[in-house]
């Protein structure tokens, strides 16, 4: 409760600082970064009402809090109705590197989360994503997200993963098959040629 009150005070004071590069403003920023992850929802709310300069500062504070334990706090930011808040949350998650990006794939299960915003973050961190995890979620998401996940897969897939994808061609979902064929077509191999011929 006390940290929440302190956070509100600091945010209010920071909003009144015209020069966000001043020593006083920077001191407030550092204090907000040290208050702990419970301030994340308040920082997300602050973005909704802030100008461009202050938004940059709040995104920087948010990015400093991103880790595997705090990730669920950011779900709220991606679910917000305000474009500024969603964009700020995307920016923070895209800037941060101190977390397992594959955990974000679970956000597809949340109807409130903006899927285009989530896809933006995943694209930024695509080289850290697991093809196995992308596939697992591709079976569960809507057509547009499915296409997005397979586009990422196409970018990051390596040849050693080909046999697993070939095995999945025997599945019942026709849309998955079409996407798998597009991914596999990237490689010029006889076994792939044979599978594509058989479809």
Please give the residue ranges for each predicted region.
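HEAT/HEAT-like alpha-solenoid repeats
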Residues: 6, 111-114
């Amino acid at each position: 409760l006390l940290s929440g009150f302190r956070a509100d005070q600091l945010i209010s004071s920071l909003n009144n600082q015209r020069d966000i590069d001043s020593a006083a403003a920077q001191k407030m920023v550092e204090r907000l970064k040290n208050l702990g992850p419970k301030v994340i929802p308040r920082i997300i709310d602050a973005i909704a009402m802030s100008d461009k300069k202050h938004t940059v500062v709040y995104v920087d504070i948010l990015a400093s809090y991103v880790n595997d334990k705090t990730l669920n706090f950011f779900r709220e930011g991606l679910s917000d109705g305000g474009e500024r808040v969603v964009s700020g949350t995307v920016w923070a998650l895209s800037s941060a590197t101190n977390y397992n990006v594959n955990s974000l794939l679970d956000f597809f299960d949340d109807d409130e989360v903006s899927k285009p915003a989530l896809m933006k973050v995943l694209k930024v961190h695509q080289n850290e994503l697991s093809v196995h995890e992308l596939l697992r979620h591709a079976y569960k998401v809507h057509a547009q997200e499915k296409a997005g996940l397979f586009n990422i897969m196409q970018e990051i897939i390596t040849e050693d993963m080909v046999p697993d994808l070939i095995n999945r061609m025997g599945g019942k979902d026709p849309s998955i098959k079409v996407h798998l064929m597009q991914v596999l077509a990237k490689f010029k191999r006889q076994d792939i040629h044979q599978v594509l011929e058989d479809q």
